[in-house]
């Protein structure tokens, strides 16, 4: 999963995981901000990239038969490093990691901006992140398929349909809630 702030990545990740017996890999950057009460410095970006990758590997090892949904992919750490700090030093490593993904879902910013606690950049930054992602596409597509998620409704269904077309169906209907 890639995309700027407030592009529906977490909602989509949770929805996909719920319908595929999947596991969501949470964001190391968010944990860093929660733990430190600030955004990272340029020299901390590499350790965040490695922490995100570690989370992905742990999820794959702990759940070898599950669909692993990365919210976001390690790639986003490198993209943010380039966007915030004009530092492209993480790009090659991020591309190597992207080659391990079956696909990347690119959540586009065509949904309303909803501020979350700890976010401070706003919709204009989200657009800048989306533009930078578009500049990474040729390299990303060499590593793995990139599937674009758009629209204000039905993103989970769109993602499922795109993934079905790419890999075949792994989806199930969510179990009804019991009232017992």
What are these regions (language model features)?
Residues 47-99, 106, 114:
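Glycine-rich phosphate-binding loop used to anchor ATP phosphates in small-molecule kinases
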Residues 24-26, 68-70, 106, 146-148:
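A structural signal for short, well-ordered beta-strand segments and their strand-loop junctions
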Residues 1:
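Hydrophobic anchor at the beta1->P-loop junction of P-loop NTPases
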Residues 4:
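P-loop (Walker A) phosphate-binding loop of NTP-binding proteins
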Residues 14-57:
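Conserved substrate/cofactor phosphate-moiety recognition/catalytic segment
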Residues 84-179:
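A glycine- and Lys/Arg-enriched "phosphate-lid" helix/loop adjacent to the NTP-binding pocket
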Residues 9:
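Conserved lysine of the Walker
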Residues 18-22, 64, 99-100, 141-142:
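Short glycine/proline-enriched coil/turn segments at helix->beta-strand junctions
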């Amino acid at each position: 999963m890639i995309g700027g702030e407030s592009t529906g990545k977490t909602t989509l990740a949770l929805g996909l995981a719920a319908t595929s017996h999947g596991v969501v890999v949470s964001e190391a950057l968010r944990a860093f901000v929660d733990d430190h009460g600030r955004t990272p410095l340029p020299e901390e970006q590499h350790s965040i990239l490695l922490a995100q990758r570690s989370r992905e590997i742990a999820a794959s090892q702990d759940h070898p038969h599950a669909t692993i949904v990365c919210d976001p992919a390690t790639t986003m750490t490198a993209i943010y490093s380039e966007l915030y700090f004009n530092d492209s030093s993480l790009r090659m490593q991020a591309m190597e990691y992207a080659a391990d993904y079956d696909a990347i879902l690119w959540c586009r910013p065509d949904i309303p901006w909803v501020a979350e606690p700890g976010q401070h950049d706003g919709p204009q930054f989200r657009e800048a992140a989306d533009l930078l992602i578009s500049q990474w596409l040729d390299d990303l597509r060499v590593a793995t398929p990139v599937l674009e998620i758009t629209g204000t409704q039905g993103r989970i269904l769109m993602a499922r349909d795109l993934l079905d077309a790419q890999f075949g169906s792994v989806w199930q209907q969510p179990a009804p809630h019991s009232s017992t």
